[in-house]
Amino acid sequence: MNDKEFAAEVLTALPYTANDQQVAVVAALARFCAAPPQPERVFVLNGYAGTGKTSLTGALVRTLEARKRRAILMAPTGRAAKVFSANSGGHAAFTIHRKIYRHAFGADAERGGPPMPAENKHRDAVFIVDEASMIGACDERGTSLLDDLIQYVYSGYNCRLILIGDTAQLPPVGEERSPAMNPSVLRGLGLKVTSATLTETARQAADSGILFNATRLRRAMALVAATPKGLTPPVPKLRTAGFDDVTIVEGEDLPEILTGAYDNAENGVADSILITRSNRRAAEYNAGIRGQVLYREEELARGDMLIVSRNHYFTGAKPRGIEFVANGDIVTVEQVYGTEARYGLRFADVRLAFPPP
């Protein structure tokens, strides 16, 4: 594979004319993908909001497909995988857990413990992980998702890994920095790291109020890091006037606006997102939306969407087409048969709809 020809094809697949920084990043990605087999090489792409990271990734995936090169898309959560797939032209995307772990059998399933690693049977594949800043180095069971991901990818012949994220996003719980986006951490795991950062705003996003304020907050974060101890850094002020994608809403109008968003036939519940400053406020808004907008007064109701928080392996008969329930999957409640309290906890007997495998 000629890296210059490959880079030209990626740039052609972009829906706009790339800026100089994007051209340089595409050239680096092309060299990475076109290089002859080398042991354990990883590419880390850090992209600020609005810099064209999503479009660039989609163009890369389409170019790999056109060249008959296998691209495997993954993300930490079901929602992130769904968005990643949509932004990549409908190319299938998996949660990391679903791809790199396998179904446990017999005593292994009954014993629980760390998940069972799957076998990477791919050859010459490029694994692309979006939202990589969410990947933690260690969970409550002492399992490192990052270590397991790396081991899985590089157990396949001539497979390589591209990690895509934004270091300004919150790191995994218990971490000060995202280990997956930290070249020093990756080198400590024995990887040869190539890294690039997109900082220039794409022209088509320059008029976005969301992007404007995200950039302002990013600069404020840099000031906080550079402020000497004992001094108070300036508090950033958000700008809301003059943007088509930012609207100030009075509290009394919020229920009507939320109802309109959730009733939207095209987007609906799945794509309506409310961001709060704390988990407590999130719980309050969730309760209010369920009761006053969706009219769901029960603790758990038909249509509720749930996020799986831990891998589950079936010890008996498996549902058709489902090997195991993966951490990060989004499932939908189809029927609630009953609830009960045991050992100080509440349990529900429900029927769930699972995402396609």
At which residue positions do the language-model features occur?
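Conserved helicase motor core of P-loop NTPases
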Residues: 3-6, 25, 29, 38-40, ...
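N-terminal pre-Walker A segment at the start of P-loop NTPase domains
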Residues: 10-29
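Soluble or luminal CAZymes and related metallo-dependent hydrolases
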Residues: 21, 141, 145, 249-254
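Short, conserved phosphate/pyrophosphate- and ester-handling motifs at nucleotide-, phospho-/glycolipid
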Residues: 22, 77, 278
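ASCE P-loop NTPase helicase motor core
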Residues: 26-27, 31, 37-236
